[in-house]
Amino acid sequence: MNKATWTSLYEVARKICWVLFLVCLPVTSFPFFPPALGGGALVRPLSLYPLIILFLIFTLPTILRKSLPMTLLSVLPFVLVAFASSLVALLHGFQPALGVSIAERMFRAWVTLGLGLAIYLTVSVMAHTPEGLRSSLRWLYVGFSAALLWGTLQAVYVINFSPQYFRLFSKMQRYISIRPLFNSRVSGMTYEPNWFAMQISFLLLPWLLGSVLTGYSVFRWRWRWLTIEWLLLGWAVAVMAFTFSRAGLISLILLILISLLFLRPAHNASPAKEKTHLRTWMRRLIEAGLAVAALVGFIYFAGSYSIFFSRLWSYWSDIKKNSLSGYFDYIGFGARFTYAETALRTYEAYPLFGVGIGNYAFTFDQMMPDQPVAAIPEVLRLLTPEVDRDQLITPKNLYLRLLSETGLSGMATFLAFLVALLGCIIFLWLSPHPEQKFWGKASLLGLISFLMGAFTFDSFAIPNMWVVFGLITSAAWIYRRPVESMPTANAQNVITEGHGEI
């Protein structure tokens, strides 16, 4: 075969692997993973399989031979600081926990961080043109359409439980996730309902809301102002309500509130009919209030089917002697507060470089606040040794993990990376072209979603944030090129602002 044939085959293989990567993103805990690829971990993204091929045949050659987005360099200081913190941690002499040595734990932690960085690098350099970005979003929507369909079918037994129906889907779920289904919550294709909710708020809502706000669509079909993104947004919100994820639903409400109040385009009114800023803000507040009230009402209706979720409001009627601390214990936040206080104490003891990536668990016993562990069953279970269990305690909060494991140096360099991403967003936002404005608004919502969601997760291996960061980097890089950043034939997918508003 000649060179042209090999090049053609290479491009076909690259595109197929990229499509598979995007479509497989909803599957986070795939049961068929060999130990060498993290078969004993909770986070087992199915997208890792096509990612390995992409990284070897495309990402690495691109890094070595071609120019790269300068934003990629902004993550390098954090990686160097994390590496330094790991080296310093070897000098502390931490004792093994649950039979796991510090060397083994650090290796696992660096594998997860390496996986996250590989996702970020690959997503950042995969698309070469605006059409490549649009195609990526379309395939992302395809994957999540399958996940939403699976979640919709799960919502049936949440609303009206049928043992036979539930057993059928439980059997099928075994081929998708390592964890069985919940009979009162929707978990999609993920490990648990909260993961599904955060997946939707990270990887789906920012782009859908950005499309609705700007009137831009990556699909050709539309009926007046109605687009595929409008339909997907309504579907995603409806399914997300049945996850009964407190963090996910709070994120949903805040994203919609921010979109309605601050990101809506202004009406094109004539000077004679132009309204004052006060009246405009009053109108927006009323509309946002009505939208949030309707959403909260729907969530309350859905929550009536879940004893777990209804605890958010049943405490004050069920418990006679109530208090704020008792309320947080009642809704299951006691363990989170223990993890958080322990992480802060660890940071105070090791302020500059922390205890090293993945080593939070080795100091947990010494840094834990003085309180009876028996009162917090979740903490007690994780501290008690069991046969064939080596799952160690983590902070369940990315900010606190960065502080406790990489210290002030790691937190500062990671925040600097986020500032670099914010610069990309501002560049896209200020562009006069509607398509770039879409990427600016959607990217801002993606960053906001991360900033909120980082309070509830701490894993570097979950693809959500790295995919969002990669799309932001890629969009800014592509539209900085003078030739390819010109308006394209997809301009017909932009409608007037008046029709594109929420």
Where on the chain are the PLM-derived regions?
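Transmembrane signal-anchor hairpin modules in multi-pass inner-membrane enzymes, especially those
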Residues: 1-96, 100, 104, 128-134, ...
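Membrane-interface catalytic loops of GT-C/OST-like multi-pass glycosylation enzymes that act
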Residues: 36-40, 190-194, 243-251, 394, ...
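Juxtamembrane membrane-water interface segments that cap and precede transmembrane helices
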Residues: 30-37, 174-189, 381-400
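A membrane-periplasm/extracellular boundary helix in multi-pass inner-membrane enzymes
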Residues: 149, 155-159, 243, 260-331, ...
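Long extracytoplasmic/lumenal interhelical loops at the membrane interface
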Residues: 326-341, 349, 353-406
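Membrane-embedded alpha-helical segments of multi-pass membrane proteins
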Residues: 40-60, 107-118, 196-204, 250-257, ...
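Transmembrane alpha-helices of multi-pass inner-membrane enzymes
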Residues: 15, 22, 53-56, 252-260, ...
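Alpha-helical transmembrane segments of multi-pass inner-membrane proteins
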Residues: 79-83, 114-122, 134-279, 300, ...
